[in-house]
Amino acid sequence: MSAPLHPTVLITGSGKGIGAATAKVLARMNWRICINFRSDNSSAEALTEELSTLTEVICVQADVAIEEQVLALFAQIDTAFGGLTHLVNNAGILLPQMPLLEMDAERVNRMLTTNVTSQFLCAREAAKRMLKLSTSVDRAIVNVSSGAARTGSPNEYVDYAASKGAIDTLTKGLSIELAPAGIRVNAVRPGLIHTDIHAKGGEHDRVERLKNRIPLGRGGEPDEVARAIAWLLSTDASFVTGSIMDVTGGL
């Protein structure tokens, strides 16, 4: 597989929120981008149109928790770009707040499949392609975890927190597996960020309610997380692997 002319990145779950913000940052850096979405095609297509004035971009619908759809997604990337050099594992869900005693197996399995299996599958397919590239080509993966991996989110989202704890472990283990090939693997742990995900958890204004707990006294913005992701992807972080960066305002 020949090396892409420019850094080429897949950002899963990038129709809105942190994923969309990351796409915008990387587009301004002239990276080639694959926008991925599961169901909100209008947001993803609008973003694709916006970024197409800056760089080469494709938009692919796929549920990255389903292996067959992941394979099809990467096949489209191969066709459009000849492969990829970078991956942002961003896709994930949050379900309505409840204590563990009220959770059933269906909910827990959905959470783990969407938030964990998806990252394993995409990391596997990305690594296959990265390993075919010359070691002179910079290659990196950034997994999106959460500050919940540290706090546990008791009485709200212990299943979500557990899924993100798994991502921290994946990041560490995979970074060691891929280090001999020069492929870097890191993660970011966003804290309370102003995105739509809180509404899906049943509390649209959760960031405002909890902002006084944050040492910086405010919630974060998606582009603040995006810039951290972009740095970890870039050659400025060429000696950084196996690291998990908290983007939490000090929480």
Positions of predicted regions on the chain:
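Alpha-helical segment proximal to the catalytic Tyr-Lys
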Residues: 128, 176-177, 238
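Conserved glycine-rich cofactor-binding loop
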Residues: 15-17
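C-terminal substrate-recognition "lid" of short-chain dehydrogenase/reductases
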Residues: 218-247
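Conserved glycine-rich Rossmann-like NAD(P)H-binding loop of the short-chain dehydrogenase/reductase
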Residues: 29-45
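Short, small/polar-rich loop/turn modules that mediate ligand/substrate recognition or access, typified
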Residues: 179, 184, 240-242
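Active-site Tyr-X3-Lys motif and surrounding loop/helix of classical short-chain dehydrogenase/reductase
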Residues: 72-79, 98-102, 106-113, 209-212
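Catalytic loop of short-chain dehydrogenase/reductase
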Residues: 136, 142-166, 171-180
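Catalytic Tyr-X3-Lys loop
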Residues: 101-121, 142, 167, 216
